[in-house]
Amino acid sequence: IRLTRGLAAAIDHPEVAGLLALMLLHHARRATRTAQGGRLVPLAEQDRGRWDTRMIAEGVEILQAALARDRLGEFQAQAAIAALHADAQTAEETDWVQIVEWYDELALLTGNPVVRLNRTVAVGEADGPRAGLAALAELDDSLPRYTAVAAYLHERDGDLATAARLYSEAAGKAANLAEHAHLTRQAARLNALKK
């Protein structure tokens, strides 16, 4: 963050400001992303009272100034998504419709399939899990975390058996031990509910 602050002071460009805003908004949640033992804490379960509100306010202020220059770039769009998450007092208050709109912008800017994958989660929250699953069906199922997203959306749709199976499958494809443990716990939780 310190280096990006220096870069932003030296280079007056909205994308440099967007990067700084994105870094601040993500860093503001650092203390709540993991629990003891390195256990991952999903965004919806994070203690928002422990988020760094000063850092969030600074990130939002920098983002607003960058967006006002009307030269949208990838980092600004990512920061806008992070700001919408940070703005919600509870997970339920998240403005998923706006987040979908920002993912649409980000997909146009980048063409990145992982952006489209992340968008399916937002669609599932904004329009319901079946809409998210329909959007997911349009993507390549070999994408990293595709199976984890499918599991989450099936769980939200009430199909716990499919979700548990997919969480187990996703755990086998996990990129790291913390993610593997998280997905394994999700599968075990749903399997316990089925009994």
Task: Annotate each language-model stretch with its function.
Residues 19, 23-26, 78, 82, ...:
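"A position-specific structural signal for the A-helix of alpha-solenoid helical repeats
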Residues 4, 11, 70, 103, ...:
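Alpha-helical junction/boundary sensor with strong preference for TPR arrays
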Residues 15, 74, 78, 114-115, ...:
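Start-of-helix register in tetratricopeptide repeats
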